[in-house]
Amino acid sequence: MKKLVHKESQWEILSQLGTGAFGRVVKAKKINCDGTGIIIDICAIKIIKKSVFTKNEIEILKQLDHPLIVKYYGYGVGEIDDNIYIYMEYIDGYPVSSILRKQPKNQFPEDIISKIVIDLALILSYIHDNERKIIHRDLKCDNIMLVNDNTHSCDVNGNCSRNGGGSAKSANQSFFTEDCVCNVNGSGTDENCKSCKLKSKPIREIQGSCESCGSDLEQDSSSSSSSSSSTINNGQSSTCRLINCIYSVSKKIKLIDFGLSKGCDGDSKYYSLVGTSTHMPPEVALRNNTACRKSDIWSLGCTIIEMAGGNLFEKDIHGKPKIPDHLSASCKNFIQRCLTIDPNHRDDIINLISHNFIDRNRINEEIKEDISKSKIQFDDEFNEIISPGDLDSVNEVVFGFDFNQTIIPGTMNSVKKIEFGGSFNKELLIDSLPSATSITFGARFNNGNKPFAIGAIPSTCKSITFGWTYNQPFYPGILPNSLKKLIFQEGGDFNRILEVGSLPSSITTLILGDYDQKIEKGVLPSSLTILELGGEFNQPLEGSIPDSVTSLTLGYRFNKALTENCIPPNCKFLKFGSNFNKDLSPGILPSSIETLILGYCFNKELVEGSLPLSITTLIYEHRDNQKKVSYDYKEVTNLSKDLEENEIIPLTPESLPESITKLTIGKNQNHVIEFNCLPPDLQCLKYHGGFIRPLIPRDLPSSITSVKLYNYNYEIKKTSIPKSVTSLQLGSRHNKFTQIQSLSNFHPNMRDLKIYINDDDIDIYNLKDIIPQTITSLIINGDNIDLPIGIEN
C-alpha cells in the first residue's frame, strides 16, 4: 500500500489503547469515508513521532497474513503534525497480561497455558519459516491478545452475563467491556456516570456456577446489599473464574507489536539491545552473539513461566529464570528446552512442536486444514494424468519424482505455485498453467527437448527455476514481462547464447548455474539487481553488467583481469570465486561496495585505495569454506605449493578501510595480524591464519566484541584480549589450544568461550579453577559444558 496522508478531520479517536516509549496506540473510527485510503471503519492506529520512526515494522507487517497475527492496513503521514500513523486491525480483546493479573496467584491453569502455547507455536512456525525468516524479539504476555468471538459477555474482571450474573450486558455483546463501572454493575446510566467511564472494578467472588464454563462461584463478602447487580439462586451477584470462561469461548489469540521485529538470513546479526529484559535471551542481553529465530524460543519459555505465575527476576545458578514447581514434568521439560543458554543447542520451533506438552493432534489438524485449502503434495510414485476438477481451488502443487504426464489445459486453472519432480520432461502447453506465479522444473526437464512456445509460460509468472538438463534457447517473447526471478541450477547444462531481448525487462534476479558464454552489452536487462554467474563462467566482464546490479557473485573459475568498468557502480555485495587472483588496483572496485568476499587463491597485496571506504564486511575465504572444484589432484597439489612459497604479506592499516566492522581471513591468504593494523571499528574477527608472535595490546581494536582465532596457541595475557570482547574461540578441531592455564587471565566481561584442547587436558575439575566464573556459555571440543563447572545436576 502506498503512503497516505492522515487527516484528523477524517477520524474520531474513541479511546487510547496503550502508550510506550515510541508513541501511543488509539482506537479510531472513520467519520469521513472519502479519501482515507482505508476500507475498515474502526482501526487501531499507532502514532509515532517521525524523528524515531523507521519503516521496519511496516515492512514486517506487510509480509504477514495469518489469522493469529494482527492485520496491517497501511500507514500515513500527518497532514498538520510531525507524526507517522500506522493503521492496523482493532482487536476486540485484552492482553493476556491483563487477564493474568486478575487470576488467583497471578497464574493460569496448565491446560490453558498449553492451549495458548499451541497458538504461539503456530505463529512462530509461520514467521520463522524460510520464506519470511522474521524474529519477533518481544514475545511476552503484554503482546498476546485474547480475542473476543462476540458470542459471550464477560468483562475483564470476570463478570459473566451468560447466566444473568455480574453484568447487565446481553449475551451477544463483548465479554471485554469498555463501559463505566456504574453502567456495568447496573447501578447507573450513561447520563449520570460519564465521569467514571472506563474505570475498572475489583474481582467479585460469589457462590454458584457459571453456565458458560461451569466454574465454581463464591460469595463476595464485600459486596453491598444495596447492589442492583443481577442475581442467581440466592440473590447474590456472580463471577466466573475469568480465564477458564473466556478461553473456553474465545479459543483464539493474536500476536501484536512487531515494532522490534527483524528479518534475518539464518546467520544475521543484531547486536542492538532490544526487547523486554525479563524475556531477553542471553545472546542478546550480553551482546555476544546473534539475535536469531531461536531468540524467540527463549522468550517463549519465559512467557510460559510468566503465565504459570513464576518470577522472571528469580534466577537459578545458570542465570535462567526459575521454573515454578507446580508445573507438570512435561511442561517443565518444554520450558527447559526453550531456555538452553547456547542458541546453537536450543530447539527451534519445529522440534518443539513435536514435544508431548503440545497437543500434536490439534497442531496437525490446524496445519492440515490450512494446507488442504491451498496445497497438495503427491507421493514419489504418483504418475497419473490430472483430470479436470481434480485440483479445483488448489493453489500449490508438488509432484513426486516419478510424475511425467502432460499437463492438460484446464486442469490447473487455480494453481499459482507448482513444483515438478525429477522425471518430468513433457512439453509445457499453452494455457496449461494460466495462473502460475512460480514454476520449478526438476532435474530431467528439457521441455520435451524443444523450445517453449510463446504463451506456454503464463503472463502471471514471476519466478522460474530450471534443473540440470534444461538447455533450450530463449527467443524474444518466450519469457513473460511479469518474470522477476530466473534460476538455472548450479551444475546444469544450460549454456545457450543469450541475445538482446531474450530476457524480459522485468527480471531482477538472474542465477546462471554453469553458464560460460560471453555476455554482450545490452543482453542483461537494466532491471537486474542480483546476478550470480556460475562456477564455469570465465569471460571478460567489461561493459556486460548493467549499472542496476547491486549484488554480484562470480563463480569459482572466474579469473579475468578487471578494469574500472567491470563492476557496476551501484554494487553493494561482491563475491569472487576460489580461482580469482588478479590485482585489485585503486579504482577497480566502486565506492558503493559494502561486502567483499575474496576466494582462497587470492594472494595479491592490497595497497592504499584498493578497497573502497564503503566496505563494512571483508571476508577472505579459505579452502574449507569452498565447494569441491573440478581440479585434478595434480593441479590442487601445484596450487597449494605455489601458495606456500609466496612471501608472508602483513595486513596494514592502508589496505583495510576504517569502515570495516566484520572481517574473516582464510588460512591460505598468508596474511598476518600486525600491531594496530585492524580497522578501529571492527566488531567481529574470524582469523584462520597463523601467528608469528603472541597478541599484544592494540593488535585487536577496543571496539571488537567477537573473536575467533583458529590457529592461536600462545599464552593468554591480561592485555592480550581487549575488554570489549565478550565472545572468544581459541583453536579448532585440527589445531588445539594448549595454553589452558592462561585462561584464568580473562577479563570479567567475557561470557562466551569456545575452546579446542587436547583430550588429555579435559579434566572438568581441574578446569574448574581455571575457567572464570563469569563465563555463561562454555563449549569444549564442540560439546556444551554445564555451568558452573563442578556442580552436579
UniProtKB/Swiss-Prot annotation:
Catalyzed reactions: L-seryl-[protein] + ATP = O-phospho-L-seryl-[protein] + ADP + H(+); L-threonyl-[protein] + ATP = O-phospho-L-threonyl-[protein] + ADP + H(+)
Q: Does the keyword Transcription apply?
A: no
Q: InterPro entries given for it?
A: FNIP, Kinase-like_dom_sf, Prot_kinase_dom, Protein_kinase_ATP_BS, Ser/Thr_kinase_AS, STK_FNIP-Repeat
Q: Pfam families given for it?
A: FNIP, Pkinase
- Residue numbers binding ATP: L17, G18, T19, G20, A21, F22, G23, R24, V25, K46
**Group of enzyme by EC:** transferase
Please indicate if the UniProt record lists Cell wall biogenesis/degradation as a keyword.
Answer: no
**Record keywords:** ATP-binding, Kinase, Magnesium, Metal-binding, Nucleotide-binding, Repeat, Serine/threonine-protein kinase, Transferase
Residue windows of the FNIP repeats: 403-444, 470-514, 515-557, 558-601, 691-733
Per UniProt, residues of the Protein kinase domain are 11-358
Q: EC number(s)? A: 2.7.11.1
PROSITE patterns documented for this protein: PROTEIN_KINASE_ATP, PROTEIN_KINASE_DOM, PROTEIN_KINASE_ST
Q: Which GO terms describe its molecular function?
A: ATP binding; metal ion binding; protein serine kinase activity; protein serine/threonine kinase activity
Which cofactor is recorded for it?
Mg(2+)
Instruction: Look up the domain of life of the source.
Output: Eukaryota
Catalytic residues, per the record, are: D138 (proton acceptor)
Tell me its family.
Belongs to the protein kinase superfamily. STE Ser/Thr protein kinase family.
Q: Supply the name of the protein.
A: Probable serine/threonine-protein kinase fnkA
Annotated organism of origin: Dictyostelium discoideum
What are the leading ranks of the lineage?
Answer: Eukaryota, Amoebozoa, Evosea, Eumycetozoa, Dictyostelia
- What gene is this protein a product of? fnkA
